[in-house]
């Protein structure tokens, strides 16, 4: 039985949680009665004195990775998880200082989201994920009616480079008056397969992590493939590239890899093994980790944590909670090769669209994003300039007619994990619809 209203979803307190000045809610929304698909959400509200703040839906990618695991627990969420999952620490740069942040685990089978139709996890794809997410939103606003008509944004990273524009398009086309969509933001996201491949391989070669021969081979084998369903020739070329890259963190080129050894292959310190375990298109899945991921895995498998979150209530999830679902990831179905047509439609509709990129990510690197956005052919209103945070260069930005591109200096794939302060600055400017701040005049 769906609880009446949102009060039943209020989180009293999470195990090991510090005292806070904001409310949290979590629970399930059934998106397909027939199939028994139910999506899990976590809402971290802004404090009372920041209200009425906008509502922002955050989506992680994969496909098959949990927004609770990544976004909420090691990036922009209110807390970071302590080693061994022993408790939580307040994140000084949490995004719910300035917005009400809603994390959604999707599709069903990811994180705490579940389905009673076991075949669902073998048949997921972009289209059903978008429609289920839309169904989730429509019902969520009924459970939280005080958020109806509130300024609403959709944001996400990585494979959410598909989810975010696809869901934004559905919301925009639905003309649902309750959902007041103002814009979207994508970080280190897949945008256009061809341009993303071109930019990714160029970045690898440019940063000296593949040989000249392999660079040529990657371009010959992969450029006309789908990112999600590469050909055997492209797979073989990326295997060679992976061997050449060695044991580095492709999600954050210049930070150490986690060296906690563990029996499972996904947490093995051998990167080639780690990447193989993440499916056929190795640079899309999983996430940056010197070990933060392990802490989340320990924490969210605690029964007291699940009870506090109203998650896995019946104990029906007879499997270990995981940050990502390999099954969903390796059996992904429809994945359009380009989001550019959606960008064009939503730019024309006047939505606020920002694309940001951590410039040390080698998985969906800045170069890929610059080529993909360049392919839109938008006129420039402010050309590439350095933006500043506390008189230091935080990154660079270019403002186009209808779209703002921002790089974040020294950040990997998960920008708020690596550069939490700069990420919060970026988020605040996005919400205000103001360009990133240039050098202040009075600086020495």
UniProtKB/Swiss-Prot annotation:
Free-text description of this protein's post-translational modifications in UniProt: N-glycosylated.
Enzyme class: hydrolase
Keyword Hydrolase: yes
A GO biological process held by the record: proteolysis
SUPFAM superfamilies (UniProt xref): alpha/beta-Hydrolases
Enzyme Commission (EC) number: 3.4.16.6
MF (Gene Ontology): serine-type carboxypeptidase activity
Record-listed substrate binding positions: 60-62, 157-159, 409-413
Disulfide-bond pairs as recorded: 65-324, 222-234, 258-291
Reactions catalysed, as given in the entry: Preferential release of a C-terminal arginine or lysine residue
Maturation-removed propeptide residues: 260-286
Active site residues per record: 158, 361, 413
Keywords: Allergen, Carboxypeptidase, Disulfide bond, Glycoprotein, Hydrolase, Protease, Zymogen
Sites carrying sugar chains: 116, 127, 259, 312, 318
Subunit structure: Carboxypeptidase II is a dimer, where each monomer is composed of two chains linked by a disulfide bond.
Family statement: Belongs to the peptidase S10 family.
Official protein name in the record: Serine carboxypeptidase 2
Species of origin: Triticum aestivum
């Amino acid at each position: 039985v769906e609880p009446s209203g949102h009060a039943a979803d209020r989180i009293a307190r999470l195990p090991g949680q510090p005292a806070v000045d904001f409310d949290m809610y979590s629970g399930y929304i059934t998106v397909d009665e027939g199939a028994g698909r139910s999506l899990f959400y976590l809402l971290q509200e802004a404090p009372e004195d920041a209200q009425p703040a906008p509502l922002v839906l955050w989506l992680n990618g994969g496909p098959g990775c949990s927004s609770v695991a990544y976004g909420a627990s090691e990036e922009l969420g209110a807390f970071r998880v302590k080693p061994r999952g022993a408790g939580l620490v307040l994140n000084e740069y949490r995004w719910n200082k300035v917005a009400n942040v809603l994390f959604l685990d999707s599709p069903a089978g990811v994180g705490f989201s579940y389905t009673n139709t076991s075949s669902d996890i073998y048949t997921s794809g972009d289209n059903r994920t978008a429609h289920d997410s839309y169904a989730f939103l429509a019902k969520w606003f009924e459970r939280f009616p005080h958020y109806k008509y509130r300024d609403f944004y959709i944001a996400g990273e990585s494979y959410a480079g598909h989810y975010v524009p696809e869901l934004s398009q559905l919301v925009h086309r639905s003309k649902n008056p309750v959902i007041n969509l103002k814009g979207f933001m994508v970080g280190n996201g897949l945008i256009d397969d061809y341009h993303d491949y071109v930019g990714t391989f160029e970045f690898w070669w440019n940063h000296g992590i593949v040989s000249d021969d392999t660079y040529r081979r990657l371009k010959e084998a992969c450029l006309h493939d789908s990112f999600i369903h590469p050909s055997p020739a492209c797979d073989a070329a990326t295997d060679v590239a992976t061997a050449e890259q060695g044991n580095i963190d492709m999600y954050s080129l210049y930070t150490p890899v986690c060296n906690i050894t563990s029996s499972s292959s996904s947490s093995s310190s051998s990167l080639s093994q780690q990447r193989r375990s993440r499916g056929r298109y190795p640079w899309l899945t999983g996430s940056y980790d010197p070990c933060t991921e392990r802490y989340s895995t320990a924490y969210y498998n605690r029964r007291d944590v699940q009870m506090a979150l109203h998650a896995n209530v019946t104990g029906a999830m007879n499997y270990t909670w995981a940050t990502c679902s390999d099954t969903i990831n390796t059996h992904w179905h429809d994945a359009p090769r380009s989001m550019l047509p959606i960008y064009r439609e939503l730019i024309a509709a006047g939505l606020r669209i920002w694309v940001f990129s951590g410039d040390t990510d080698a998985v969906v690197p800045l170069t890929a994003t610059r080529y993909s956005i360049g392919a839109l052919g938008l006129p420039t209103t402010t050309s590439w300039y350095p933006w500043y945070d506390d008189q230091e260069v935080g990154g660079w930005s270019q403002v186009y007619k209808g779209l703002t591109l921002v790089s974040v200096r020294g950040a990997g794939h998960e920008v708020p994990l690596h550069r939490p302060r700069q990420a919060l600055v970026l988020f605040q400017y996005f919400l205000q619809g103001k360009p990133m701040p240039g050098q202040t005049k009075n600086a020495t």
